Amino acid sequence: MRTTLHCFVLVTLVAPGLAGAQTTPWGDPDLQGIWSNQTPVPLERPAALANKPYFTETEAAEVEKNALASVLKNIASEIATSGEFNEIWLESGKGRVGRSRRTSLVADPPDGKIPFTPEGRARWEATPHLATERMTGKRLGADRPEDRALQERCITNDSMFIGGAFYNNYHQIVQAPGYLVIVSESTHDARVIPLDRRPRLGANIQQYLGDSRGWWEGQTLVVETTNFNDKRRFQGSTKDVRLIERFSRIDANTIDYRLTVTDATTFLQPWSLENTLRRRDESVFETACHEGNYGLASILAGARATEKR
């Protein structure tokens, strides 16, 4: 087996007076910083809002207020619930409705729904989701570690591509001449994105995060990602899924983000979601996942004990 190791040294220089600059010293639009994609808006539009693609300003403020109130209510509760989690780690009440005020992250098709093929929907529903049982209400298998979700096994997640998770929504963008790197808080995912139009990896090289290539269209960064492996299911997709991301800096504290997903086996048509990335002044700390990960072993051991009854 051949292992290829790429080492990149990334140095960011911030001189006095340049902190608010929108361009890097080498002339690229500056997207650097720590950004959060947390939002209370669901991926797909709820049935109750089927004919309402946008919130009003007042409604958006109410959605944000209710999301925070729900978290505060849970913190105040003295009754332990199954699967409860220290609220100090959670961000579910800190999200904002996107700049467009859409009622779903899915922006196209216009109905706010992912356009699954029958095969794609069946695959998605049968796949161990990145989300846990607490989030989905569905019991995952426990015959082997591979039955559990990728995030639960400390491998990877889709937090950059989707947003709205209840924790680990911070992403640090670092730039160097010819490269842009996105380091995600959860599971230490680091996407090194060349910007020099180099050839893609061979089709036989497939990765959890795929193979990304980026370029600038005016002030917008466009990133195309292919070469995924078949060990993950991005909304039920196959390894042939193609993702196109667009990052547009709006002001010092805001980036508009749009993702377009194409996979003819899984979706009836390409579909897109929109979210807003907002600057955060905090730091991104280490996510210790494998360290002290007693949960996975305990789940499997509990399943074996149940089988012996």
Task: Locate each region found by the language model.
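N-terminal secretory signal peptides that target proteins for export/translocation
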Residues: 1-3
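Bacterial N-terminal signal peptides
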Residues: 6-17
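PEST-like low-complexity, intrinsically disordered acidic/proline/serine-rich tracts
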Residues: 20-309
